Amino acid sequence: MFTAWILNSAGDTVRQFDDCMNISVLTENQMQEQFPEIIDAIGFCSDYVVTVDSQGRHFYPLYIYSVSIG
């Protein structure tokens, strides 16, 4: 496990995952095929960064957010 920080476009940390197990990037097409309900709920078509911790998957549009690991 490792720590991951989700950063907004200003570089501010909006979420920290202390028990992150995986980070991946899904293209907009992959998101539409695999997780259309997430795009509907968030309301934003974009490539997404997906973090996985003990609570499950967390989705953040890459147009707005970035991720840093440590």
Spans of features found by a protein language model:
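Short secondary-structure boundary micro-motifs
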Residues: 8, 32-36
